Amino acid sequence: MVLQKNKAMTVDLESIDWAVFKTAYGTATFVPKLIVQLAGNNHEIAMGASHELWCALCHQHAYVSSAALPSLPFILKVLDGANDALSVEILDILLGFAVCETDGTENAPWLEQLRAEVTRAHRRFRALSSSQNETVAYFAVAILEKIGEKNLEMLQLL
């Protein structure tokens, strides 16, 4: 089942032209490999991939890169099945998506869309905010605070 899930994810990842997106390190052509590793069965490799994604997509919470937008749905899918340790790392990435601005070198119409997509995932964060794992709960609450109740109210009107 996991193999089929990862194969479907790989097909979906390959349908995106990652070369048009940027990371902190340049073009995002390496991001799909990291997402596949994040979703894989090897916990150590997944944890390493989470760190690399954190550095590349929301560069140490200093700024967010355009590759965050196409990465988001895949990262959210992985979060749904992640253990607590991996969930903490993924939530840290997602917090970066919620709080970081761009590095200022590019026009960033995608940033508003990224924030809207993070806001649409609020039910996941609400569920995780009551996790028995205090760190998971902390990050989920932090994301909810950053996306704000005003944004959630606007979503309910849509």
Q: Residues of each region from the PLM?
A:
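Short inter-helical turns and helix N-cap capping residues of alpha-solenoid HEAT/ARM repeat scaffolds
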Residues: 41-42, 80-84, 132-133
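HEAT-repeat alpha-solenoid elements in large eukaryotic scaffold proteins
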Residues: 5-13, 43-56, 91-104
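Buried hydrophobic core positions in alpha-solenoid tandem helical repeats
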Residues: 33-35, 74-76, 124-126, 158
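Flexible loop/turn segments at the boundaries of HEAT repeats in alpha-solenoid HEAT proteins
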Residues: 20-24, 60-68, 99-115, 151-155
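Core helices of alpha-solenoid repeat scaffolds
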Residues: 27-32, 67-72, 114-122
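N-terminal "cap/leader" segments of large eukaryotic alpha-helical scaffolds
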Residues: 1-46
